[in-house]
Amino acid sequence: MSYQTIVNNATTIQINNKPISSATLSRSNRLKTALRGEAIYRFNVAVGRAFEWNATNRAMLQILQQKGRTVEEEITLSQTSGMSYIMGYAGTLDSTQLGDIDIASYTGATLTLDTSNVTGIDPADTLFDVGDYIQPANSRYTYEVTTPVFATDITLNEVDVPVHRNIYPASSDGGNNIVGAGINVANNCTFHVKCLSAPTHTLQPGKLFTFDGNFEFVEVIL
């Protein structure tokens, strides 16, 4: 049973990509806050349905238990019919236009995109809206857009796209240099995760079994 199978059968998915921070309140009632870690993705997945206790599922369950916390897998939130809205694209470009965009450069939490190969962009187009998912095509990491990006923002065939965290360099991305790569958008984006916590399972009448709690998947940063 793969992690993707768990996600595909989810009843609910809780998503947390907030940066880790701390807060202390002094005896003089002065509040101090500090960032303690980067914004990585955490998914808390509940699976409410029952599974048939057959040879196939029993074998997959055993595989799932053996993975523990050490096995990394790639997942998406939109593989199952009816879930595409979770990572849906809110801009107005079509798939061909998005496929013609390349990454020109990056700095901090900003991707600079090359639109020189894109045809048919209208001045009224929204390239990306807040919350859109974007992933360099050769990268492990997915980012979320934090500011609307319009066609009118394009200057000399380049446009800046602010995202929710700093762009990971090649040294933290398996040696992949994202400059010159294309982009994956919305439902084409993926996450590399490990299962930090997995529930036990309970056998039910009728040759069925259910999971007793939620799965917690955490993004793996190299």
For each of these PLM feature ranges, what is it?
Residues M1-L222:
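Extracellular/virion structural assembly segments
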